[in-house]
Structure formats: C-alpha cells, structure tokens
Amino acid sequence: MLEKAKIDRINELSKKKKAGTLTADEKVEQEKLRKEYIKSFRTHMKGTIENTTIIDPKGNDVTPHKIKQMRKNKK
C-alpha cells in the first residue's frame, strides 16, 4: 500500500480543499497523489481477488469462471 506520509498528505490537501485554501501547485500534487493511491489500491485489490477461492456449504469450489481465468492467465 501507499506510505503513511503520502496518505496523510492526501488527507491534509483534502482538508485544505474543503477550506478553500488549496493552491494551484497543491492541486496538482493532490491529483498526482490520488492517482498513485488509486493505482496502488487497484493492484492490491486485484491480488486479493485473484487469490480468493469461494467454497459453498457443500464444499464445492464455486469461484467465478472469470477469476479462475485470471489465475490461469497469470501463470
């Protein structure tokens, strides 16, 4: 995930934006940090989904076909 300092900076810039005191340079920085955060989040979420197996109460693997295909393509 993203470094704590960067997340703190995103939150700080968000508060400044709400207060109406965000400068143009800070707005550019905020957008860059948000994009970096979203990219990191999506990468980690994709990894979590790819490594999830769904088992029904009868013990059958009912993992969606799309996830199985993602695993197969990864190998």
UniProtKB/Swiss-Prot annotation:
Keyword Cytoplasm: yes
Origin superkingdom: Bacteria
Intrachain S-S bonds: none
Chief site of localization: cytoplasm
Start-end of Basic residues biased regions: 65-75
Keyword rRNA-binding recorded: no
Pfam family, one: DUF896
GO cellular component: cytoplasm
Subcellular location: Cytoplasm
Region named Disordered: 55-75
Keywords of the record: Cytoplasm
PANTHER family assigned to the protein according to its UniProt record, in alphabetical order: UPF0291 PROTEIN CBO2609/CLC_2481, UPF0291 PROTEIN YNZC
Family note: Belongs to the UPF0291 family.
Designated name of the protein: UPF0291 protein lin1342
Organism, scientific name: Listeria innocua serovar 6a (strain ATCC BAA-680 / CLIP 11262)
